[in-house]
Amino acid sequence: MSRKSSTEYVHNQEDADIEVFESEYRTYRESEAAENRDGLHNGDEENWKVNSSKQKFGVTKNELSDVLYDSIPAYEESTVTLKEYYDHSIKNNLTAKSAGSYLVSLFPIIKWFPHYNFTWGYADLVAGITVGCVLVPQSMSYAQIASLSPEYGLYSSFIGAFIYSLFATSKDVCIGPVAVMSLQTAKVIAEVLKKYPEDQTEVTAPIIATTLCLLCGIVATGLGILRLGFLVELISLNAVAGFMTGSAFNIIWGQIPALMGYNSLVNTREATYKVVINTLKHLPNTKLDAVFGLIPLVILYVWKWWCGTFGITLADRYYRNQPKVANRLKSFYFYAQAMRNAVVIVVFTAISWSITRNKSSKDRPISILGTVPSGLNEVGVMKIPDGLLSNMSSEIPASIIVLVLEHIAISKSFGRINDYKVVPDQELIAIGVTNLIGTFFHSYPATGSFSRSALKAKCNVRTPFSGVFTGGCVLLALYCLTDAFFFIPKATLSAVIIHAVSDLLTSYKTTWTFWKTNPLDCISFIVTVFITVFSSIENGIYFAMCWSCAMLLLKQAFPAGKFLGRVEVAEVLNPTVQEDIDAVISSNELPNELNKQVKSTVEVLPAPEYKFSVKWVPFDHGYSRELNINTTVRPPPPGVIVYRLGDSFTYVNCSRHYDIIFDRIKEETRRGQLITLRKKSDRPWNDPGEWKMPDSLKSLFKFKRHSATTNSDLPISNGSSNGETYEKPLLKVVCLDFSQVAQVDSTAVQSLVDLRKAVNRYADRQVEFHFAGIISPWIKRSLLSVKFGTTNEEYSDDSIIAGHSSFHVAKVLKDDVDYTDEDSRISTSYSNYETLCAATGTNLPFFHIDIPDFSKWDV
């Protein structure tokens, strides 16, 4: 549609009877829509196009457009300022109210605890005790992985359960010792002890573990208070799954020597593949401990299968008509499954007591846990030995990553499953404060456990307060059951560890899902697992981080920019699909009543309505699947280049965009001033023209060249198969679609300036640069600062858009009409609109809310 420039927009038809034209225009549109519907049903493709020369009711469509749209009031769009940004994004966060809200958010318990009731309390009590019965044996087992005494696992368990309930935003997560963090703690202890003489006693494993807990707590708390939880999102899910799987594989093979009774012969701190080799090599050294390891392991798996799968299937099969009995039986199986670790340990501890009591350590036939101090004997402020922090510094990053990633991944997962919001920043504060306070009880790093959290969720826990009951169970065990802990077989604890950690192994289904979703994710997962197994857990973690960051960088550096073509489409409202219903579903297979309903539904559909528009889609739509692959995409008018940037326009990718756009311009258009040098040797090396075979080679190979004379000074484009060439058009318009650009920077804007200079020099004229779909006011500000978007004498004077300036208009509605109501909105006629206004600034003729239809322009 031809429009005048913004300086020439005036009301030229003030005396026209607007109401008459509005009525005529509505009648015309209704008649046109009816003709289009008839044309589509008759298969006449020409009816898709609007016949602008046809007159209806004494006025043409173009005349109506002139009356209704050509005259719009000027709208001077201003650039965004720092004050506006402050008022919009910062000001509301610096008030006393926001400060109070921030302080309250640090203690989520304030919001929900006043509503606590008996129903919640009962559910939390059941869940807390159930998880506590699992946590006690697991915590002692995981302390064994961390090369610590069992009591340190109990210390970490009870303090984690108590403190986390005050700061948590997840009701399901259970804080305490976990397998992967215990393995990382053991690695840190081993690496630090290597730096000290063997005979020193000042720096011990418990001191190193507690110091690690302190440092992890400080960092996690700081990240949470500063609201830097978004940094956790930089590591992808497949990367986390990779090092978790590798770590689980490491733990399982590290526990097999203890399971078989020859753990003193295998160094489980080596690389996993070496542990596997040495474990298999020493199988002949198996002792009686294998009985207390293999049998409990088999029992645990059979118990889990029976109570979790087979028993429930039997209940559904034999009590199908008795749902209450079936539900009670399922509840019994559920709690029986939850208690399997505790029951197995109790049974085999009793057997161990019967064969090891009143015997010295040398005479005992199996290895047992030994003395576990009763109560909280280690409470107090710890003293950090000199030089310990510097010796631990290299181990801190990997430890913090394991601590934070595992917890955030678990909490967000259960938040999605159980429909509540988890705040990552607050969760960082929760685990940070938990570990900070844990240092006073000489605990080692604790974080969220997946298996215990899943159990807690299945117990229908209602609030985080259930952690208090869980901590109470652990505290009760510390004071009352330590004498019984003395006789727990170490092989049985290893069986419990293997059984629990095996759930961390990623299944083949998840791996296949990674492959189907994104093959690169699957590759990173597999490589991370191999690095963790054949090198170390730290290297696996660092590779996972580097891979995630590299993928982000590569996606930015190699943008998915697309050159666009146009296609005319129509949105069909209430279409009548022309297909045989029987081909989809046989009406003979439907009941008569339902069959009548289906037929009646098809018959009462309203008449289709069409909304025509021009859409810009990539030329490779067959690959991108943005459009039906059978649709033909027409190129822009000659001399017009339309390019869509697929991501943010920054210093990382601006050079690549520059090259892609300028190469396409040289391919599709010709120079504005032809090179007419007499000698071919005088042409520039980067534009030598068409290559001609020397006469000697022609005679040698009897090469027959086409005799048609061509101008060698013209750039050669894609010709037809018979060797003919054509003269390419001059470049007139470059349109950049910024609808997917979230931000720009100074380097990228400067590359646009350089592109404009190069293009103007190549075309030997001022070329129009149009921008569509800009979604940020700061992008507009950046472009305007270098004289894009508006007319100026240097790059784009008024003459280059004379006769074809384009603006989108919007309809301003009256205040007395409820446009949120569907019926009111449909029944509202054009006369209910108050006026028309420019959708974008009339002072910015090169900025558009959508890509203009350049085929209507007189360029």
From Swiss-Prot:
The chain crosses the membrane at residues 94-114, 116-136, 148-168, 173-193, 206-226, 234-254, 292-312, 332-352, 395-415, 428-448, 468-488, 525-545. It comes from the Eukaryota. Residues 630-808 form the STAS domain. InterPro entries: S04_transporter_CS, SLC26A/SulP_dom, SLC26A/SulP_fam, STAS_dom, STAS_dom_sf. It is found in: Membrane. The keyword Chaperone does not apply. CDD domains: STAS_SulP_like_sulfate_transporter. One of its GO terms (molecular function) is sulfate transmembrane transporter activity. SUPFAM superfamilies: SpoIIaa-like. Belongs to the SLC26A/SulP transporter (TC 2.A.53) family. High affinity uptake of sulfate into the cell. This is Sulfate permease 1. It comes from Saccharomyces cerevisiae (strain ATCC 204508 / S288c) (Baker's yeast).
